[in-house]
Amino acid sequence: MRFIRERRAADPVPRPPRLRRAGALTVALVTLVAGGVLADRDAVDARAASGGSAAVGGHAGHAYALSPEQEAAALELQLAPVRGSEFRADCPSKGRAGDDPIVMWGRPGASHTHEFFGNTTTNAYTDLASLRAGGTTCNPVADKSAYWVPTLYQNGVAQKPQSVRIYYQGLTDRANVKPHPQGLRIVVGNPLATSAGQNPAARWNCVGIPAASGDFPVCPAGSKLETYLDFPTCWDGKNLDSPDHKSHMAFGLGGVGGTCPASHPVPVPRLEFLITYDVRGTGLSLAGIRDGANVTTAPGYTFHGDFFNAWDEAELARRVKNCIVDGYICGNDGQPIQQ
């Protein structure tokens, strides 16, 4: 038997099948570096509970713009050869609700409908303590993180994901990658987008068809719909959240194997959501916000997602070291996959 390990520069580097399907994508998200950050949960909770950050920003907290330099960096990161340096968690849906414990903390029912994965206690009042005490749908059970995305609809009927896989990948400064700190919160994507070009973190395609789109494709019989969502790879090293829920994070520069900007010097694994739905054809839409109102008719290019880290710290650190730093593709148990 042998293990799957990262191929070195002299070796051919084929794309893994899951990424080959999305090989037509030519854009990826780079988070704008902005000022004004919050270092602790209590401050964020207090602002949200008093109608501060959550009430003022609402879903405007998801909006962003890309500079030409950042677009170029994103393109380089997306198109560079993908190395075998990752681990994963499979986290079936635990249900849906109109809550968003990052953007609209303490306001149950205020958000458009989200599909929640991972921690079984996630609601509008979720904090790190409740996640630590909760259960999880994830394999491995060491991952008690909360993950969520807008609910998908077909002809007005909510669709439960068939599968949800969360990849943790070593793309930026792999030798120095650090685990995400417990309590880290990240939002990625743009629910206020008016075109696919305004939301390059998200993409859709049909299983088995090597093309990707910012909006819903029409999947033929025999296929099904899937979506990818990419998270940033660099942390500022200080703040577990920020007022816009993104400025404490940034994407690495220089493509795969590149480095973090000085403003965000700590490389972390890139999260990539891979969500599959057993649907095809037309009539697709997302839960979202349009003209200030929650709707179920938002277009595919408004897809976005949230991550609230509650991994067991020792297990996450082990996987980062044994899989990402050491250059292996690992399974759900955090061990190199045998073939």
Residue spans for each PLM region:
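Secretory targeting and sorting signals
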Residues: 1-45
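Generic hydrophobic/packing signal
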Residues: 31, 40-42, 102-105, 233
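Ser/Thr/Pro/Gly-rich low-complexity linker/stalk segments immediately outside membranes or between
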Residues: 42-54
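Primary mode marks residue(s) on the alpha4-beta5-alpha5 output face of response regulator receiver
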Residues: 51-111, 115-229, 236-339
